[in-house]
Amino acid sequence: MAGIAAKLAKDREAAEGLGSHERAVKYLNQDYAALRDECLEAGALFQDPSFPALPSSLGFKELGPYSSKTRGIEWKRPTEICDNPQFITGGATRTDICQGALGDCWLLAAIASLTLNEEILARVVPLDQSFQENYAGIFHFQFWQYGEWVEVVVDDRLPTKDGELLFVHSAEGSEFWSALLEKAYAKINGCYEALSGGATTEGFEDFTGGIAEWYELRKAPPNLFRIIQKALQKGSLLGCSIDITSAADSEAITFQKLVKGHAYSVTGAEEVESRGSLQKLIRIRNPWGEVEWTGQWNDNCPNWNTVDPEVRETLTRQHEDGEFWMSFNDFLRHYSRLEICNLTPDTLTSDSYKKWKLTKMDGNWRRGSTAGGCRNYPNTFWMNPQYLIKLEEEDEDQEDGESGCTFLVGLIQKHRRRQRKMGEDMHTIGFGIYEVPEELTGQTNIHLSKKFFLTTRARERSDTFINLREVLNRFKLPPGEYIVVPSTFEPNKDGDFCIRVFSEKKADYQVVDDEIEANIDEIDISEDDIDDGFRRLFAQLAGEDAEISAFELQTILRRVLAKRQDIKSDGFSIETCKIMVDMLDSDGSGKLGLKEFYILWTKIQKYQKIYREIDVDRSGTMNSYEMRKALEEAGFKMPCQLHQVIVARFADDDLIIDFDNFVRCLIRLETLFRIFKQLDPENTGMIQLDLISWLSFSVL
């Protein structure tokens, strides 16, 4: 219940703009300005109680409290490390980012790329911070986290060993923005050790809010040059690098003056006519301008003399230091990897860019209800969340003569780094894309069934299921309606996720799910219509007062179920029996008369029949995945969110729902639907309750 209330509150806040860059969510409700002012007024330096200068903030295993790697560590403020500490001096440069004793080179590569764009850097690292003016030992940074911007506050106590920073540091040792940025990122992920191992694209996304894709250039798709051109037109950040094979290879310079393991940026892609044929050229920037390419199409290459002078002048006059052209074929031959971070429309302030259209959907997998696993598990795969995407407009320019709608799909699992301290790690995740059959187009209130997936192949799917934070692929499909089904590889893995779709043209989306529906059988009977046999049975069971209490009902039903071999049951709990009596006790006596007992008896017989039919393995019990079908047979259709609540409430640790809990669930549902209908005679779908009414119904 608390989780549902929190989600509703969060959705309302998001609708009001909370989570945008301008109104970032305050992580752990820490307000930077208020905390800084408190410290300044008190004349004290900030000490962060939520990320203390203790071993728990370092790690849990390799950097755990008893690890040899953490012995002798002291937490010091920059003012204790050097004489004249600076937050940032002369802009952000590569020399500000030197790796320490932590395997987070993926993060540092992303930070290095961040330094190439001052506007985006300023969003993540507010530059109006210093160790002089209004210094209170507190700093703040902003990160994108699964669809919202989050402001993270840290104190400036940093882990040191032998007087030197243990982790990220500047080459000069006096600039601290990168070390404090790393600390803030460690805080939001639980500890420093949680940052060990990752993909640069993860850092790209958390610093920009974009969606990052990468290409192994030895397996480059045939249209990669056009992909690069379009990405540049959309203001995307593009980086490339040459793989290293050993630590000694790092920063090694090739004979044509390219640096291995070095982060380059791609800044241009043009086709020029040379010697009667078109040449594809790529412009690359070495952000630190130390060495430049000496191969074909370098600044002094005679190839430029074969190009129209006006074109040559246009392409070469805007050169920055460290920027050079090379042929696309040489690019594919010499570089190993290309990363493209496609930025969201709100990140791009210039109107000159052709902006992507962004769609984001949140969801979760819950053990026993919506965590169905991949297609290898056909009995449960259909239980996964399902999302509809409508592609309506084809791309403006159709490359390679292929028409269709280009879009990227990224599936991100949330908060998994933070859970490493609890022994958890990344799930293996992926997704499939299915074309909606013609007879179902235009409908959004149907959760596609097991039969559909048994008889329908995926139109597209993620390249692989992988245990990274995100799996992402680029697709091109004809206009139409498609269902995206995200899943973990194995079923019953709890997790939260978000799906983002970047499309060249606007794409509509929505969750595909069953609408709430209740078709409750009305048993309309008078006492005169009840047969004599049932009357005699009731007289024997009810005793002298001719009524049956909840306690008497429990005894009766235990005897009945004890005779059945096809349903495993220890009888009904007194709670279930009280719920049954409450639903049918029209006169408020707390007991059931003849007619009321007849109606209950009829319902229980119906529930027994459903329970037996759904129990296909004849185990005498029902697993939680069978519950959805059982509820439909009983007349109830509900969305995934309610199925998650039902499984959490009525299934045991082994995801078994026994007959007692099955009946209790159905009785409670029927009671709640009847109450709602009584209070909403006009079928508006809304009711108003005062506090006492809400509490009265809630304790049912």
From Swiss-Prot:
Annotated ranges, domain Calpain catalytic: 45-344
Protein localization: Cytoplasm; Cell membrane
Region Domain III, annotated ranges: 345-514
Catalysed conversion reaction: Broad endopeptidase specificity
GO BP: cellular response to amino acid stimulus; proteolysis
Binding site for Ca(2+) 7: 615, 617, 619, 621, 626
Active-site residues, Swiss-Prot/TrEMBL: 105, 262, 286
Prosequence residues removed at maturation: 2-19
Enzymatic class: hydrolase
Positions of Ca(2+) 3 binding: 91, 96, 175
Residue(s) carrying N-acetylalanine: 2
Residues where Ca(2+) 2 binds: 229-230
Cofactor stoichiometry and binding remark: Binds 7 Ca(2+) ions.
This protein's record includes keyword Aminoacyl-tRNA synthetase: no
Regulation of activity: Activated by 200-1000 micromolar concentrations of calcium and inhibited by calpastatin.
Similarity comment text for this entry: Belongs to the peptidase C2 family.
Protein name per Swiss-Prot or TrEMBL: Calpain-2 catalytic subunit
Organism of this sequence: Bos taurus
Originating gene: CAPN2
